[in-house]
From Swiss-Prot:
GO molecular function, one term: metal ion binding
Biological source species: Saccharomyces cerevisiae (strain ATCC 204508 / S288c) (Baker's yeast)
Disruption phenotype: Leads to cold and freeze sensitivity.
Catalytic activity: 2 acetyl-CoA = acetoacetyl-CoA + CoA
One cellular component term from this protein's GO annotations in UniProt: mitochondrion
Main localization of the protein described in the UniProt heading: cytoplasm
Name listed for the protein in its UniProt record: Acetyl-CoA acetyltransferase
Family designation: Belongs to the thiolase-like superfamily. Thiolase family.
Induction (record text): Induced by low intracellular sterol levels. Also highly induced by cold conditions.
UniProt-annotated binding residues for CoA: 186, 231, 252
Record function comment: Acetyl-CoA acetyltransferase; part of the first module of ergosterol biosynthesis pathway that includes the early steps of the pathway, conserved across all eukaryotes, and which results in the formation of mevalonate from acetyl-coenzyme A (acetyl-CoA). ERG10 catalyzes the formation of acetoacetyl-CoA from acetyl-CoA. The first module starts with the action of the cytosolic acetyl-CoA acetyltransferase ERG10 that catalyzes the formation of acetoacetyl-CoA. The hydroxymethylglutaryl-CoA synthase ERG13 then condenses acetyl-CoA with acetoacetyl-CoA to form HMG-CoA.
Length: 398
């Protein structure tokens, strides 16, 4: 019951911009690409019989068909006997999937679990609520599925960015600080791309050629190249016109992508002679008032550290926070009194992108890359989610 949980493989797709390079792919198709990439790294595991369960995050599930996680599993070649569950914890969905997978192994219910998440925000549909009963008279409206189910608070109806503005006011974080943070995120991501830091984690996505044109491959994240410093600093505020601080440029963009992590028990690790990449040391989750979701990671991280048996936060080598907004990275670093040089060292979601159901796994995948390439041992990933919550995971590189 207390057996260790190991990460033996990770993979992710490049992250595509909204209506960009990955727009022809559904969330399920992206998820299958990521999972196939992860499977290819562990040929010792037999896809036809060794996998017990898949737990995959997905937020904008409308029009994807039943059970997206199940679709991903079968599209990637896993057995019909695999148990599949789709998780919606908004932005934290894929991290929750990893936590649930680890718990399943810890409890002895499974030995090999696929966890991760997928999202195509580009392909999320518009809804027509009046169509079911029939609009009787006058104009009707289309409801944007991305906005309704992904980007607006369910309790007050306000955009997540309005709450990001509240965070900036409450914690005295300026527009200049947010712009500087965003620019640094882009610059770190660009540098990491140039140096090949993401190469081992990214699986290329093949895009079918149109009208006889050859197929093409998307091999790198699309957003980092879009940095224009002057435009970023002069961008208008979106959510608060007077004295606002949050802009589209210092917030994460709308994106498409998928990530997968393969977890195994110690029993299977030894039986299959697998090489472990990391051990999951612990996890923690927290929640408070929905309007303050931005700094919920600062509540989840201490819980994760306690669960992992780590008493001193300064003993953590690297942190990976999902940058839903620049203010999220800033406020959690501030509250936890972290050294900024240890946070998001390859850049974050402001520059890389934030495909909702994928991001919780993406930050874990990138955190492991950082530990492997920058000489770290202990890493902490954390992500906030709409509704006031957050999830966090502690991993130790092996």
């Amino acid at each position: 019951m207390s057996q260790n949980v190991y990460i033996v493989s990770t993979a992710r797709t490049p992250i595509g911009s909204f209506q960009g390079s990955l727009s022809s792919k559904t969330a399920v198709e992206l998820g299958a690409v990521a999972l196939k990439g992860a499977l290819a790294k562990v040929p010792e595991l037999d896809a036809s019989k060794d996998f017990d369960e898949i737990i995959f995050g997905n937020v904008l599930s409308a029009n994807l068909g039943q059970a997206p996680a199940r679709q991903v599993a079968l599209a990637a070649g896993l057995s019909n006997h695999i148990v599949a569950s789709t998780v919606n914890k908004v932005c934290a969905s894929a991290m929750k999937a990893i936590i649930l997978g680890a718990q399943s192994i810890k409890c002895g219910n499974a030995d090999v679990v696929v966890a991760g998440g997928c999202e195509s925000m580009t392909n999320a549909p518009y809804y027509m609520p009046a169509a079911r009963a029939g609009a009787k008279f006058g104009q009707t409206v289309l409801v944007d599925g991305v906005e309704r189910d992904g980007l607006n608070d369910a309790y007050d109806g306000l955009a997540m960015g309005v709450h990001a503005e509240k965070c900036a006011r409450d914690w005295d974080i300026t527009r200049e600080q947010q712009d500087n943070f965003a620019i640094e995120s882009y610059q770190k991501s660009q540098k990491s791309q140039k140096e090949g830091k993401f190469d081992n984690e990214i699986v290329p996505v093949t895009i079918k050629g149109f009208r006889g044109k050859p197929d093409t491959q998307v091999t790198k994240d699309e957003e980092p190249a879009r940095l224009h410093v002057e435009k970023l600093r002069s961008a208008r505020t979106v959510f608060q016109k007077e004295n606002g601080t949050v802009t589209a440029a210092n917030a994460s963009p709308i994106n498409d992508g998928a990530a997968a992590v393969i977890l195994v028990s110690e029993k299977v690790l030894k039986e299959k002679n697998l090489k472990p990449l990391a051990i999951i040391k612990g996890w923690g989750e927290a929640a408070h008032q929905p309007a303050d979701f931005t700094w919920a990671p600062s509540l989840a991280v201490p819980k994760a550290l306690k669960h992992a048996g780590i008493e001193d936060i300064n003993s953590v080598d690297y942190f990976e926070f999902n940058e839903a907004f620049s203010v999220v990275g800033l406020v959690n670093t501030k509250i936890l009194k972290l050294d900024p040089s240890k946070v998001n060292v390859y850049g974050g979601a402001v520059a890389l992108g934030h495909p909702l159901g994928c991001s919780g796994a993406r930050v874990v995948v990138t955190l492991l890359s950082i530990l492997q390439q920058e000489g770290g041992k202990i890493g902490v990933a954390a992500i906030c989610n709409g509704g006031g919550g957050a999830s966090s995971i502690v991993i130790e590189k092996i």
